[in-house]
Amino acid sequence: MSVKIRMKRMGSKKRPFYRIVVADSRSPRDGRFIQQVGYYNPLTEPVDLKLEEEVIMDWLQKGAQPSDTVRNLLSKQGIMQKYHEARFAKK
């Protein structure tokens, strides 16, 4: 089972917001997920982004792979940098 951290589309037509979820890679985009770890609303000014950093770090250490878009959001928040530092500090 490959686990991904990805965005689940919510909201109405032409007014999307996204929940950032941990899901099995085989489940549909808006389908079943394991855990919600944040949300992202691109329509507000400034952009509304909330991430549960400790939970995301835990999933990354367990081997979950972020999607490209989620990886960019995590990088902007500095979470990917902390993950890489923690990962290479152990070796």
Swiss-Prot record:
Key words of the record: Ribonucleoprotein, Ribosomal protein
Any GO CC annotation of this UniProt entry: small ribosomal subunit
GO MF, any single term: structural constituent of ribosome
Signal peptide: none
InterPro entries on file: Ribosomal_bS16, Ribosomal_bS16_dom_sf
Keyword presence, Protein biosynthesis: no
SUPFAM superfamilies: Ribosomal protein S16
GO biological process, one term: translation
Any Pfam family the entry gives: Ribosomal_S16
HAMAP family recorded: Ribosomal_bS16 (MF_00385)
Family indicated by similarity: Belongs to the bacterial ribosomal protein bS16 family.
NCBIfam families found in the cross-reference section: S16
Protein name: Small ribosomal subunit protein bS16
Source taxonomy: Bacteria, Bacillati, Bacillota, Bacilli, Lactobacillales
Gene assigned in the entry: rpsP
